[in-house]
C-alpha cells in the first residue's frame, strides 16, 4: 500500500513540474516579445510609438489566421482532387501525420465548394429514352475491373449534364483578364470532342467535352476540357441525341445570338474533333467498314487504288442540312449541324496509330502473355505498347529477320517515310503543300506492285500492299490532312488531339465508379457516381478561377 501512494506522489510531482515548466516557458516567451501593451495600445519596445489598438490587432490577427487556415484546407482539397486521393486514404494519412487537418474539415470544405458551384453551374440528371447496351464482339475492353463494371451497369438509364453557357459565364472573365481572350475582338473558338470507353463488355462510358482553342498552352491538359454531357450506356446516334438535347440547343443559340457576359456579347466559332467512330456517329454517317467510308469526300472502296484521282473535301454542312441523302453513306441529320464540315477534324493520334498498328499486325510482332497470380485465377494478361513505343518498334525492328534482304529494304524505306510524315504532322511549321506531296509519294510506295512473270520464267519480285489494304485513316492522311492543315493553320493539328480527352475519360471511370474509393465506401449506385464526377468537374473550375488558392507544384531534383 505504501508503495502505491509513493508512486502516486511521484506522478503528482512530475505533473506539477511539467505544468510549472510550461508556465515558465510562457513567461519567458512573453518577456522576449518585441512588443508590449500599454494603455490598450501595442507599443514598439524601441520606439515607444503606438501601432494599433489591441482589439483591432487581435481581430486582424484572428481573421488572418482563419483565412490562412481556410486557404490551407482548400489547397489540401485541391491536392486530393488533383491526385484523386480518396477519403479513406486521406484519413489514413491524417492518422499518421497529426499536422494534417482532420478529414472532416476537408470533407466539409469540399461539400461547401460543391454547394457554391452548383448555384453557379447546376448539375442536371436526365432520363435516357434508350438503355440498350451493345458493345461489338471485337471491341477491346478498356477497363475490366469487375467493381467498376457493376457500378457502371447500375447507372445505365441516367445521364448527367451541365450547361455550356453556365460554364462559359464562369470562365470567360478570367480568360479575358489573363489575355487568353480579347474583349475588343469578342470571338471565342470552342472545340467540341467526345469519347467512349469500353467498360468490360457490358457498357460504355460516353463523355462529351468542350475546350477553348484560344487557350493554346493548356489544350493538352485533361482538366482544361470541360465535361458537358456524360452517361453510361451505348455509343450510338439515338443515345447521344437524347443525352445532348440541352447541349445541342445551347450550341445553336450561341451560334445565332452569341453570349452576353459582363455587357460584352461574345460570338463563337465551333470546331469538332474525335476518333473516327464518334465522329461518324455525330455526323450521322456510315462506319469505317462501309463502301462509302469518307466523311469529307465521295470516294468509295472500289476507288481506293486510283492514284491519279485527287480526292478533295467536297461535302458541305449546308447540303447535309438541306438533304443529307444527296451524299451516299449519310443516314441521318448531323447532330452538330451548326459546325461547318471543314471544321470537323480527325484526331491526329488515331490517324498515326491505326496506320502503324496495321503494319505491326502484318509483320506479326509478338508479345509475351502470362497468367495472373492469385489462387484459382484463370485470367491472362499481356504486354501492350503505347503509341510512341509502337513507332519505335517499327523504326528499329530488324525486318531482315522476317523478309528477304530486298523486301526488307523496301519495307524499311516505306516506314522511314511514314516516320517523316509522323514528324511533319506534329510540326506546326509544316508546309501543307509539301506534306501533301510527301503523303502521295508514300502512298505510291505503299502500293508498289509486284514484278515478274513466272509463266515466262521471270523472277517474281514481290510488291508491298494492295489497294484493298488502304484503310480510311490512310485515305485521310494522304488526301485530306493537308487541307485540314490549310483550313486550320492558325491552330495546327496538334490543337485537335484527343489524347487529353481519352485520358480524362479513363481516369474518371477508373476512380468515380469504384465505390470503395469514394464517399468513405458508402456509394450505393452509379447514379451518385455521375453526380460525384460532375461535382469534381465543378471543383476543378473553382480551383482554376480562384486566385486565393496557393497550391505549389512539386519540383524534381536530379542529382548527377
Task: Briefly describe each language-model feature range.
Residues 1-560:
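A structural signal for the principal folded core domain
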Amino acid at each position: 500500500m505504501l508503495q502505491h501512494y509513493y508512486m502516486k506522489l511521484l506522478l503528482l510531482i512530475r505533473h506539477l513540474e511539467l505544468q510549472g515548466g510550461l508556465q515558465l516557458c510562457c513567461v519567458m516567451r512573453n518577456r522576449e516579445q518585441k512588443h508590449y501593451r500599454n494603455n490598450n495600445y501595442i507599443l514598439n519596445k524601441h520606439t515607444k510609438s503606438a501601432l494599433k489598438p489591441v482589439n483591432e490587432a487581435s481581430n486582424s490577427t484572428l481573421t488572418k489566421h482563419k483565412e490562412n487556415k481556410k486557404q490551407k484546407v482548400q489547397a489540401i482539397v485541391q491536392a486530393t482532387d488533383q491526385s484523386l486521393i480518396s477519403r479513406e486514404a486521406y484519413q489514413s494519412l491524417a492518422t499518421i501525420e497529426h499536422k494534417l487537418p482532420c478529414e472532416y474539415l476537408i470533407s466539409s470544405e469540399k461539400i461547401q465548394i460543391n454547394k457554391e458551384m452548383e448555384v453557379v453551374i447546376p448539375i442536371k440528371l436526365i432520363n435516357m429514352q434508350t438503355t440498350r447496351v451493345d458493345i461489338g464482339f471485337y471491341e477491346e475492353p478498356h477497363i475490366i475491373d469487375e467493381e467498376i463494371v457493376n457500378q457502371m451497369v447500375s447507372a445505365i438509364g441516367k445521364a448527367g449534364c451541365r450547361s455550356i453557357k453556365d460554364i462559359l459565364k464562369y470562365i470567360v472573365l478570367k480568360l479575358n483578364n489573363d489575355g487568353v481572350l480579347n474583349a475588343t475582338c469578342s470571338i471565342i473558338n470552342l472545340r467540341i470532342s467526345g469519347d467512349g470507353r469500353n467498360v468490360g463488355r457490358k457498357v460504355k462510358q460516353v463523355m462529351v467535352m468542350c475546350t477553348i482553342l484560344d487557350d493554346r498552352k493548356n489544350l493538352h491538359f485533361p482538366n482544361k476540357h470541360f465535361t458537358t454531357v456524360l452517361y453510361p450506356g451505348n455509343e450510338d446516334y439515338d443515345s447521344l441525341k437524347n443525352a445532348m438535347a440541352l447541349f445541342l440547343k445551347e450550341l445553336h443559340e450561341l451560334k445565332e445570338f452569341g453570349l452576353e457576359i459582363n455587357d460584352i456579347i461574345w460570338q463563337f466559332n465551333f470546331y469538332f474533333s474525335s476518333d473516327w467512330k464518334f465522329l461518324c456517329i455525330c455526323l450521322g454517317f456510315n462506319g469505317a467498314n462501309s463502301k462509302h467510308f469518307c466523311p469529307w469526300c465521295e470516294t468509295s472502296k472500289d476507288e481506293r487504288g486510283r492514284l491519279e484521282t485527287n480526292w478533295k473535301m467536297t461535302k458541305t454542312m449546308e447540303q447535309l442540312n438541306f438533304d443529307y441523302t444527296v451524299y451516299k453513306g449519310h443516314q441521318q441529320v448531323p447532330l452538330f449541324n451548326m459546325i461547318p464540315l471543314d471544321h470537323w477534324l480527325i484526331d491526329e493520334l488515331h490517324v498515326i496509330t491505326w496506320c502503324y498498328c496495321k503494319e505491326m499486325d502484318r509483320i506479326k510482332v509478338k508479345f509475351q502473355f502470362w497468367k495472373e497470380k492469385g489462387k484459382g485465377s484463370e485470367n491472362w494478361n499481356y504486354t501492350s505498347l503505347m503509341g510512341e513505343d509502337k513507332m519505335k518498334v517499327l523504326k528499329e525492328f530488324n525486318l531482315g529477320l522476317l523478309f528477304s534482304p530486298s523486301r526488307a529494304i523496301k519495307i524499311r524505306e516505306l516506314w522511314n517515310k511514314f516516320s517523316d510524315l509522323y514528324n511533319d504532322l506534329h510540326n506546326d511549321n509544316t508546309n501543307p503543300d509539301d506534306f501533301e506531296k510527301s503523303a502521295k509519294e508514300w502512298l505510291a510506295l505503299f502500293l508498289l506492285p509486284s514484278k515478274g512473270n513466272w509463266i515466262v520464267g521471270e523472277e517474281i519480285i514481290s510488291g508491298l500492299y494492295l489497294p484493298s489494304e488502304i484503310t480510311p485513316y490512310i485515305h485521310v492522311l494522304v488526301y485530306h490532312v493537308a487541307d485540314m492543315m490549310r483550313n486550320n493553320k492558325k491552330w495546327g493539328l496538334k490543337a485537335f488531339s484527343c489524347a487529353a480527352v481519352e485520358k480524362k475519360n479513363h481516369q474518371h471511370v477508373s476512380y468515380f465508379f469504384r465505390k470503395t474509393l469514394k464517399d468513405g465506401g458508402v456509394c450505393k449506385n452509379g447514379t451518385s457516381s455521375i453526380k460525384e464526377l460532375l461535382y469534381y468537374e465543378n471543383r476543378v473550375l473553382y480551383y482554376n478561377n480562384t486566385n486565393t488558392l496557393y497550391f505549389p507544384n512539386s519540383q524534381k531534383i536530379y542529382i548527377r
